[in-house]
């Protein structure tokens, strides 16, 4: 299955911030959406998620046009979204946060509890399962949010700045989790200002510049492209790929 955009255009007043952008993500791959501030990457990401409606262009889940569908309908079709801002319910425990989503999936109570226990174990949340959201560290919160996102059994997950506001150890933890999601045949779209952390785990990436796709290709191809280095990465950029084959 593929999630793809075709010829997306977004204008604010007389300014075109996204200018005929087409991207795609397949299940089982990690794709980066990169670019400097003002390049249009966040707007493109939000249109793909369903938070912003395009002026022109289409968004498809396989061959089904989902352009006009709001975010909650896209979630029902298997498109999960993890916001940059804290999205966990601060006054609820970790397990109640996850259960709040499981209760909407049509599972029996027994199936909900079984899935809850599986997610708690998978994301190493046993010690904090009864802690409220406000008591979690940045890394614990991210893990809880990803676990809650998985409660809908998504085919795709959209990650908005997943490495923002977490310490280096938590960054490695999140990268490992993302690699595991890929191994579950989930497609991942990441937009993040942390270029090193993002490119170290992506299979492919799109670089947006002045509202258009300047370059698309593998992380290695992007890192070696002279135009990309000149306009975005810098001439001294060195790609540091990580091996997640054993996760």
Please identify what each model-predicted range represents.
Residues 110-128, 176-179:
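Conserved ABC ATPase "signature" region
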Residues 65-80, 85, 109-110, 129, ...:
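ABC ATPase NBD coupling module
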Residues 34-36:
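The feature captures the beta-strand-to-loop junction immediately N-terminal to the Walker
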Residues 49:
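Helix-to-loop junction immediately C-terminal to a conserved catalytic motif
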Residues 153:
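Conserved catalytic motifs of ABC-family nucleotide-binding domains
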Residues 132-136, 140:
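Conserved ABC ATPase signature
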């Amino acid at each position: 299955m593929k999630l793809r955009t075709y010829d997306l255009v977004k204008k604010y007043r007389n300014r075109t911030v996204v200018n005929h952008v087409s991207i795609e993500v397949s299940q089982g791959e990690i794709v980066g959406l990169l670019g400097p501030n003002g390049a249009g990457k966040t707007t493109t990401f939000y249109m793909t998620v369903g938070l912003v409606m395009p002026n022109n262009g289409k968004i498809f889940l396989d061959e089904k046009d989902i352009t006009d569908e709001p975010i909650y309908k896209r979630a029902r079709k298997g498109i999960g979204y993890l916001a940059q801002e804290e999205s966990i319910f601060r006054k609820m425990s970790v397990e109640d946060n996850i259960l709040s989503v499981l209760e909407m999936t049509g599972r029996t109570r027994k199936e909900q509890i079984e899935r809850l226990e599986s997610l708690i174990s998978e994301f190493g949340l046993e010690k904090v399962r009864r802690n409220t959201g406000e008591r979690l560290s940045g890394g614990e919160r991210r893990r809880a949010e990803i676990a809650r996102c998985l409660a809908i059994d998504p085919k795709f997950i959209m990650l908005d700045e997943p490495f923002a506001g977490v310490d280096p150890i938590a960054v490695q933890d999140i990268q490992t989790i993302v690699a595991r999601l890929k191994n579950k045949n989930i497609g991942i779209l990441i937009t993040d200002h942390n270029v090193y952390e993002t490119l170290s785990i992506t299979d492919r990436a799109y670089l947006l510049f002045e509202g258009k796709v300047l370059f698309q290709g593998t992380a290695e191809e992007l890192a070696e492209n002279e135009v990309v280095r000149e306009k975005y990465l810098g001439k001294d950029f060195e790609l540091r790929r990580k091996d997640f084959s054993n996760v």
